[in-house]
Structure formats: structure tokens, C-alpha cells
């Protein structure tokens, strides 16, 4: 058993994302464009593109929007050139934060990220200052009540690295990032649909926040998430209910 409010934290993040669907679409279009540019327009041979397309379909994005983003990425349509940048920093009590961005203006982005950190009690670190505290992996989270033994058998057979039951009853499955699509397909084929499935930077240790500190930490994370150039925010902070 591990973790204590994983389910609540994931549900909060998912609800916040659903509430900003228009912004989610914009982020996904950028991600699809970059994925197609870097790895080609065939999702069968481009795992990153497959993942971003799956996310777009889960977000009910029209297929035409997805195809236009792919065409833009492979050079079939005019569009903005985006650059991938990762920023690292700290929140309250030294909580580690990773901010992944896609931007057409590095100067603007770093200024906005730095401002969000400083305004909400955090500070930016140097490259590599917190990334070592995280593991790059595929992550699946299943609702409390999912049959643990059957899920474990299916996950390990599919190529998962680990299956952990959290204190709240949710079950977390992790796998190598390059195997994410195959493991996801195998789990769904076995009848297991994850509530949340993504390739993430998973914290190796967590820092819990409650009361006023939890509210302050959440404001920092929200401020970073709300920046237009930010694609993903990862943290080892656990916000208690």
C-alpha cells in the first residue's frame, strides 16, 4: 500500500482540466503538431503522436482538427514553429515542480513562468535541479474497487513495471514510457479502463500540504497551469482535502 490521497489529487486535476476544455484543445493541437513534426504523421510508428491523438479524442476534439494539426506538423500546412522547453523550480517547503512548455517565444515564456513562481511563494531552479526526483513513465490510475488481483495479472502480462494499491483503494500501474500505448491497449482489451492514463514525470517521493499551505501551493500550481505556453506541470506536492 502506498500514497494517501492519490485519487483525490488526480480527480481534482482531471476536473480542473475538464473545466478548461478550450485550453486543453489548444494544448493538444500544439502537442500533435510538434509530435508529427519530430516523428512523422503515422501514429503507428510515432508513439508520441499516438498518445496525443488519444488524448485529443478523449477530449472530444473533432477529427478534422486533429488531421490539420498533423498536416501542419509534417509541413503540409503553414503554422507556428514551437520549441520545447522544460523549467524546474520549487514551491512551498521545497516541493519540486517541473513545467513543460511549447512556445514560439522563449523570452516571453521564461518571464511568465518566473513571475508565476515568484508571485506565489516559489522560485525557479536551474536545469536538472529537481528532474532527478522524478521518473519518466507511463501511468494508469484505476478507481477504488477495481479487482486488484485480476488487474495485476493483466498489467504484468501487458508489460507493466509495477502495480501499487494506494491507501485510498485506487490502483496505480506504471510502465516504460515507450510501452505506454501497447500496455494501454492490452489493459483495455482485458476489460480495464483507467480513469487517468498518461506519460508523466512521476515523483519518487511526495510532500504533503494541508490547510493554508495547501491553498497556497494549489494557487502556484494553478498559476503555472494557466499559462498559455505551459503544456504540463508535474510536482511531488500532495494537496490534502
UniProtKB/Swiss-Prot annotation:
Which coarse location class describes where this protein primarily resides? cytoplasm
A single Gene Ontology CC term:
cytosol
**Keyword Disulfide bond on this protein?**
no
- Annotated GO biological process: regulation of DNA-templated transcription
Pfam families (UniProt xref): TACO1_YebC_N, Transcrip_reg
In its UniProt record, a GO molecular function of this protein is:
DNA binding
Keyword terms, alphabetized:
Cytoplasm, DNA-binding, Transcription, Transcription regulation
Q: InterPro entries, per this entry?
A: Integrase-like_N, TACO1_YebC-like_2nd/3rd_dom, TACO1_YebC_N, Transcrip_reg_TACO1-like, Transcrip_reg_TACO1-like_dom3, YebC-like
List the subcellular locations.
Cytoplasm
The organism's superkingdom is given as Bacteria
Quote the Gene3D superfamilies the UniProt record gives: 1.10.10.200, 3.30.70.980
Homology family: Belongs to the TACO1 family.
Task: Please state what the protein is called.
Answer: Probable transcriptional regulatory protein RALTA_A0859
